[in-house]
């Protein structure tokens, strides 16, 4: 089975790289197509995958096609519906649910195009990702099972109802940027008090990774973990109170709301 990436920006490349490095796909099975052919060829060469000169070439070579273009470009790249007949389309575009594709394909209901909408995040590149999969889709049962099995090699896959697809996508897909901001802020504080920049980034990143792992593996509630770290009249509780005074919780909720309003 060959897999194509129609669009090869940050998210498409992260997912392709993760799947190849995890061994879920062989490089020889993977193709990509993008407008900037020079950049595409360089990226494909580094991964050992095939670069396609046109959408038509990619479609001809692929059974599964990841749509990794902007939502505004979807109708354009799918203009030639006939060439996608019998293919499995896997959307990575924010705001493009199953219903959106059904509306797009409504004029040609018999072309046999099956589709599923996903919202992955960049950590898929290192097999530590999260992928939100919309529960509603038009894939055959065996196709759906096979696809989820492949995706689980690089991510925690969460299947959610359409009503929660957007909010789950924001938490999984946008929040890595929020987490990176938090890491950067911690590192800035470390540098302010004498740490070397690279060491400060290492400490902050590993702290966040370890804290997340502890919550996942032990099942401890985040509030309980916070309480475990805070000793009476200690330095940690002083820091926690400072975060509350500065509105950390409110800022995070506002950030999610802002991201959700544009999805």
From Swiss-Prot:
Gene3D superfamilies: NAD(P)-binding Rossmann-like Domain, ProC C-terminal domain-like. This is Pyrroline-5-carboxylate reductase. It catalyses: L-proline + NADP(+) = (S)-1-pyrroline-5-carboxylate + NADPH + 2 H(+); L-proline + NAD(+) = (S)-1-pyrroline-5-carboxylate + NADH + 2 H(+). It is found in: Cytoplasm. Keywords: Amino-acid biosynthesis, Cytoplasm, NADP, Oxidoreductase, Proline biosynthesis. It comes from Treponema pallidum (strain Nichols). GO terms for cellular component: cytoplasm. InterPro entries: 6-PGluconate_DH-like_C_sf, NAD(P)-bd_dom_sf, P5C_Rdtase_cat_N, P5CR-like_CS, P5CR_dimer, Pyrroline-COOH_reductase. It is an enzyme of class 1 (oxidoreductase). Belongs to the pyrroline-5-carboxylate reductase family.
